[in-house]
Swiss-Prot record:
<dbReference type="InterPro" id="IPR000305">
    <property type="entry name" value="GIY-YIG_endonuc"/>
</dbReference>
<protein>
    <recommendedName>
        <fullName>Structure-specific endonuclease subunit slx1</fullName>
        <ecNumber>3.1.-.-</ecNumber>
    </recommendedName>
</protein>
<keyword id="KW-0255">Endonuclease</keyword>
<feature type="compositionally biased region" description="Basic residues">
    <location>
        <begin position="131"/>
        <end position="147"/>
    </location>
</feature>
<dbReference type="Pfam" id="PF21202">
    <property type="entry name" value="SLX1_C"/>
</dbReference>
<comment type="similarity">
    <text>Belongs to the SLX1 family.</text>
</comment>
<dbReference type="GO" id="GO:0000724">
    <property type="term" value="P:double-strand break repair via homologous recombination"/>
</dbReference>
<dbReference type="Pfam" id="PF01541">
    <property type="entry name" value="GIY-YIG"/>
</dbReference>
<dbReference type="InterPro" id="IPR050381">
    <property type="entry name" value="SLX1_endonuclease"/>
</dbReference>
<dbReference type="InterPro" id="IPR013083">
    <property type="entry name" value="Znf_RING/FYVE/PHD"/>
</dbReference>
<keyword id="KW-0479">Metal-binding</keyword>
<feature type="domain" description="GIY-YIG">
    <location>
        <begin position="14"/>
        <end position="96"/>
    </location>
</feature>
<dbReference type="GO" id="GO:0008270">
    <property type="term" value="F:zinc ion binding"/>
</dbReference>
<dbReference type="InterPro" id="IPR035901">
    <property type="entry name" value="GIY-YIG_endonuc_sf"/>
</dbReference>
<keyword id="KW-0540">Nuclease</keyword>
<keyword id="KW-0539">Nucleus</keyword>
<dbReference type="InterPro" id="IPR027520">
    <property type="entry name" value="Slx1"/>
</dbReference>
Amino acid sequence: MDDTQIEHPRPIPIFYCCYLLRSTVRHASLYIGSTPNPARRLIQHNGVVKGGARRTAAEKLRPWEMVLVVEGFMSRLAALQFEWAWQNPWYSRHLRSEESSALAEVKHRRMRKAKSEDPEFLDSNCDSAKSRVKGTPKKSKRRHRPPRSLDTYFSDLHRLLRSTYFSHWPLKIRFFSGDIYQSWKAWYDRVDVRLRSPVKVILDGSCPEISAHAGGNDTRFGGVENAKITYAAIRDYIEKAIFLLDDPKDVRCHVCQGQIVPTEELTTVCPQAECHCTCHLLCLSRKFVDAALEPNQIVPKHGICPACEATIEWPLMMKELSFRSRAKQELLEILKRKRRVDRKQGAVTGEVESSSRRTVSVDLDDRFGQHAEDEFLLDEDWWEGLAAESDSDTDLRLKPLSKAAPKLETVIEDSECDDADIL
């Protein structure tokens, strides 16, 4: 038997975003990337630690600032898709307007008609093709993309967010720069076409606090340097789900009223602290989709809990479910500790509950790196594979749980393929 390590599916990233960088020296210089850790990625771009992108390495443009992020991606691949489309609006199928498609079709029809009606046209094209074959092979030239202004970036972002593909994703825009937000607001007020569904805007960093833009789960980081998001953010939610499903005797689906077997079925748990609602994944998703009344919707964005009637976000439940179903080793250690405590103190019910809760909390704190967030984000075992940078473009493999992965030491090639707008 070989020693090849089998990689299992990772939990859904607790946070992944596409970001827009701006040079503080030359505001016209902009850069697009994606990352699960904005705080770390920014200091890499600024050369504080190794691992930055080549196109942001010019000292004359440093320091860079992260002015806005688009967050809410459920996987690294999803963020990469959005990042590439934002970087390459000329080639992205998501930004091809119906008008340009119609013009291309008309041009194609005219070409076919000219070929069919004029034989000389066809012969001349054949001769030119032969001459190209016989001649010196044409050297491929590197495509130089036209520089884009800030308004152009806004326009491309706006078109992406209202495209058929991305408009159904639970995406949010978080602004860290007050003047960039004001520029966006002034630009958006001039646009005739609105987004298909309201995209939540979160004002952070130097932006003024406006309660209308704040949501229950959309906390302000206070700045990019504080944007270090780990699974510790939903620790209590994960603990509650583990306790509810550890003894499945009385676990029933609140939608179909059927018995739930957590070890065999994907089970959702309400994130509200006082609610013990459990449902089959398919039952709850069908209920949410039916209530949304959107014909093209397949995956729900949010819905009303059938027990407590609170509005709950579907992505949040999926993050907890993916951790519970995919981080098997962590859960086994937590449950083993809990059951040992239950056996030792089974005579005193109240003490059992309190001690188990405290033990699990300590264990989760260790796993989530509550007291060492930087080490957790950079080096923690299974998470590092999940938190690989899109623009780092290096496949970081999982290490044994007892060892820490080495820190990034190489300068990383651009995920943008050298298309940062350096003016």
